[in-house]
Amino acid sequence: MSQPQLTQEALAREAALPENLWIQCPYCKQGSYRESLGNAQVCPHCHYGFRITAKKRLSLIATATEEWDADLVTADPLDFPGYTEKLAAGQAATGLKDSVWTGQATIGGQSCALGIMDPKFMMGSLGTVTGERLTRLFEKATSANLAVVLFCASGGARMQEGIHSLMQMAKVSAAVKAHSNAGLLFISVLTDPTMGGVTASFAMQGDITLAEPHSLIGFAGRRVIEQTINQKLPQNFQRAETLLQSGFIDAVVQRQDQPSYLGDLLALHTA
């Protein structure tokens, strides 16, 4: 029996369809019409928040902004092969000079210091400029008597900068401590992914720690742990809901609810 032949009209209709009409959620694996994700880029089936740039998140969360330290540029301290090309690619993809946006913003009618790490820039990895901008964020917030809201998204320390990258964990943590000693509020919002040295330092030092649904949060990756202990880990291991159940975080908040939720928290602590 011969196969039916596609008509020229059918072929033309298929060719006219735009690409990437459908997208698969990396968490629930359900396919969705891309437009159904909405402006917030959230899976309509499980509420997983797709990874977005810092500037996109800024447009979702804040109504007024002033960027700080935008002129800081990453160098290549170790002359690491291919690093300058990766930096250029990250800058082109995000419009940032490194993997974090910092500044002053208004969220839910409340003024605060705001930091947003960008997973589209070398997976939000922590380099010298990222660490410096975060340190200055907390220092300026302390001087201005402002609360800090920090959206964390990172694969960890940036290997292309070696020990220079690892030093940022302690440097940012010291600035967080000084901000805390001044009696000021720090809200940490963990997004997908928050891993490695970022989790091991400032991401988990907030007075209030929130997370987006189903975000991957941890230190070492699943495969590394499974190979080390020679056991299969549970399906929801290192997911936001598991951390909430275990008491590591305070709440899981859907992306579209974050402006009002954060605004209420800021209002309570600045009244």
From Swiss-Prot:
PROSITE patterns assigned to the protein according to its UniProt record, in alphabetical order: COA_CT_NTER
Start-end of C4-type zinc fingers: 25-46
Reaction(s) catalysed by this chain's protein: N(6)-carboxybiotinyl-L-lysyl-[protein] + acetyl-CoA = N(6)-biotinyl-L-lysyl-[protein] + malonyl-CoA
Organism superkingdom: Bacteria
Annotated localization: Cytoplasm
Subunit comment: Acetyl-CoA carboxylase is a heterohexamer composed of biotin carboxyl carrier protein (AccB), biotin carboxylase (AccC) and two subunits each of ACCase subunit alpha (AccA) and ACCase subunit beta (AccD).
Entry protein name: Acetyl-coenzyme A carboxylase carboxyl transferase subunit beta
Species assigned in the record: Lacticaseibacillus casei (strain BL23)
